[in-house]
Amino acid sequence: MSGRLVVDLQDVDAAGLAEVGGKGAHLGELSRIDGVRVPSGFCVTTHAFRRIMAEAPESGELLDRLSRVDEGDQEAVRSLAARLRQVVGATPLPDEVAAAVTGALARHGERSAYAVRSSATAEDLPTASFAGQQDTYLNVVGTEEILRHVSRCWASLFTERAVTYRGRQGVDHRTVHMGVVVQRMVVPRASGILFTADPVTGDRRTATVDAGFGLGEALVSGLVDPDVLTVRHGEVVARTIAAKRRALHAVQGGGTRETPIEERRQREPVLTDDQAVELVALGRRIEAHFGSPQDIEWCLDDDGFHIVQSRPITTLFPVPERDDDVFRVYLSVGHQQMMTDAMKPLGLSMWRLTALAPMYEAGGRLFVDATARLAVPGSRATLLDVVGRGDPLTRDALETVLENGEFEPTPAETDGGAPPAGDGAEPDEADPSIVTELIERSRRSLAELEREIGTKSGPALFAFLREAFEEHKRVVGDPLNIRAIMAGMEATWWLNDRLEEWLGEKNAADTLTLSAPDNVTSEMGLELLDVADVVRTHPEVVAFLEGVEDDGFLDELPKVPGGAEARDAFEAYLDRYGMRCVGEIDITXPPVRERPSALVPVVLDHVRAFGPGAAARRFEDGRRRALAKEREVLERLRDLPDGERRADAARRMIRQVRAFAGYREYPKYAIVSRSFVYRQALLREADELVRAGVLADREDVHYLTFDEFEEAVRVRRVDERLVRRRKDAFRSYQALTPPRVLTSEGVALSGAYRRDDVPEGALAGLAVSAGTVEGRARVVLDMAEADLEAGDILVTRFTDPSWSPLFVGIAGLVTEVGGLMTHGAVIAREYGLAAVVGVERATRLIRDGQRIRVHGTEGYIELLS
């Protein structure tokens, strides 16, 4: 195939992407499906495009410059793209290319009308459609016109929209080439688009048909409103008939013309129900062939339906793979862990290997199957209650699934499920000494892991790790560990419910848990204030840190007066917290021990914003406030009827919540501490593969599963194509927003607030830390780029424990993801910040620098400017 300038569509299949581009490869593959009619034609190959680019003056230099330009510099992008279009469009077609196209036209009918369609190699891919980025020309007649439009298609690879889109997708412009499809025109009476899955809800069982009169380009370009038909299980279940006032038609001799539609026909259905069902059946055949939901362009003439394009619907959130047809309901793990970014394959596989429950993978995220718990009334009520307290949006999404009738619960039966957490009963008291015991057990287990793993390498390391994962699960799943976590949560729920009922006091536990002991995440933030105390006593150290640009600064720091003491303070901090990082549930994310420069701006901010001893003062202030709140609450309770009994119950629960609330953060710390040890050992193996020439980059192992990594170490070989595919898939997954709830049929649900107490124009969320604060919003998407001042309100997508040092100086917190007991909420309460989480699209609806008011008790945000 190498070097061909023209190839007939019938000789192309999906493997021809590099030769004919995405559209051409898909059309060739479509033409091979039984019962699918694709207009005949040929492709001008990417070899012809390369010939043009080789002969086009300046093209190489312009492409190099375009690939280096910052995608945010739109003026530079616009200028370079325009120059490339001009250069390519002005380059004459080589004689061999013109002869090849002319010969193909002679075979297919040189007097016929054709569609001339761009087909880039970065187009209609499984992970990115690139739809509409290059040009298509309809009803082109005559050899000279077709040659001219082939040249125009080549130039359209460099339209500003195409260049911008590729830049955002991380595609190097120098690696993309253009094929051109030249295809016999179908002159249709109707045309449109078929989505074999609902593009809004994601439901794979529901197909949507958009249909209009005449050529489909009018519909694709938004010139006309289409009829919309919804087809499910072989029948039309909904239809909207639009007023179709205009249509696009082919003109005799070439070109197209927009024409008005007679008034009497404007409300006529474009398709009958039978035709819509027939079209969807055709779409299902195409979907089955390609193995994923498709966005299909179709047209209808007297001979029936013709398919002129099919591409993956890349905006749908993927569905976990399964081996049965049972309707299933999945809950997002990332929303519970406050990390909704896509994870790499190594991180996904290791989380699954160490998880207590089966995990299911989709879109680079993890989900748990909640079907069994929803099936039985008792466990269903408990799940909805517990989930609802932590994250009302997830509860609403689950209730939507139940209300839609998709899920068929089992009849009422005794299932041994616990009563809902809010049933009013006082929780059993737990022995506070178990916290000390659990922490000591965890430390001993970690020390043993560190001692033993150092002696392992090669295949023996992976065998050892599999045993370590079992110990990992034993530590995390220890019933005593679960009891300690639940003791704090149950006491929190009881106090909040009863004190609001008895005293009208909302979220009283927020204050009662201030400066609770054993909260390793709040200690992480406060201890960085202690590092700042060391740094501030040495002006030369401060000056040195202000110039830090890389992660090697700790080696240079002792050369500065006072630097040795400062280095020791940093090292002590890293010894305890260096395993933490943004997105720490993914073992491939670099911990702060490997990126210590991330601490420098936070330490310098603390030096400027706080005086010496701030950590101890803040902790003691929190403890005093908690004790004062306890005295106040108990005194008010004693004044009520049956007050002594109520006060005694509250005292017991306050004692319990203070004993156990801090421990809520420890299990995650223990998990990440173990994962850091795993990571160090695995990276040593990756480095060995690099030294052996098996890998080009140690981080390529991030795109292998644990099993694949083990195999690579054993056989000393890695499939580079697999790694490239995984990198492409990861980039596409990063662009997807994961739902809180996902069904096995692809319905993605994020939930909604059902409230009438939110002022008009305010943003609703979940109240997780009491108080009201007004200040400047700082919208931060990357912790490393945070520029916060005292009194600012942090607005971000999510926070995990690694963000804790930033909480020390801010006044409030707003996140898009989170729940009552997730880490950001716990630490916001610990630091006394007004906080609202679960605010949908907060980082887009709140402007950086905008003044806002956070109502942490009521759960909403007012936009003030």
From Swiss-Prot:
What keywords are annotated for this sequence in UniProt? Antibiotic resistance, ATP-binding, Kinase, Nucleotide-binding, Transferase
Name the InterPro entries on file. ATP_grasp_subdomain_1, PEP-util_enz_mobile_dom, PEP_Utilizing_Enz, Phosphohistidine_dom_sf, PPDK_AMP/ATP-bd
Looking at the record, which segments are called Disordered? 403-430
Q: What does the record list as GO biological process?
A: response to antibiotic
Enzyme nomenclature, EC number: 2.7.9.6
**Where is composition skewed (Low complexity) in this entry?**
409-424
| Disruption outcome | Disruption mutant fails to inactivate RIF. Mutant displays a modest twofold decrease in RIF minimum inhibitory concentrations (MICs) compared with the wild-type strain.
- GO MF annotations for this entry? ATP binding; kinase activity
For the region Swivel phosphohistidine, what residue ranges are annotated?
A: 765-863
- Region: Rifampicin-binding, residue numbers: 327-752
Q: Could you tell me what induces this protein?
A: Up-regulated in the presence of RIF.
Identify which top EC class this enzyme belongs to.
Answer: transferase
Q: Which reaction does it catalyse?
A: rifampicin + ATP + H2O = 21-phosphorifampicin + AMP + phosphate + 2 H(+)
Q: Does the keyword Nucleotide-binding apply?
A: yes
According to the lineage, what is the superkingdom? Bacteria
Q: Which residues form the active site?
A: H823 (tele-phosphohistidine intermediate)
Q: Which residues bind ATP?
A: K23, R117, G132, T136, Q183, E297, Q309, R311
Function statement: Catalyzes the phosphorylation of rifampicin, also known as rifampin (RIF), leading to its inactivation. Confers high level resistance to a variety of clinically used rifamycin antibiotics.
Family in the record = Belongs to the rifampicin phosphotransferase family.
Q: Which NCBIfam families match?
A: PRK06241.1-2 (NF004877), PRK06241.1-4 (NF004879), RIF_Ptrans_rph (NF041857), RPH_KJ151292.1 (NF000283)
Domain description: Contains three domains: an N-terminal ATP-binding domain, a large central rifampicin (RIF)-binding domain and a small C-terminal swivel phosphohistidine domain that harbors the conserved histidine residue essential for phosphate transfer.
**This chain belongs to which protein, by name?**
Rifampicin phosphotransferase
Q: Which organism is it from?
A: Streptomyces sp
State the gene name recorded for this protein.
rph
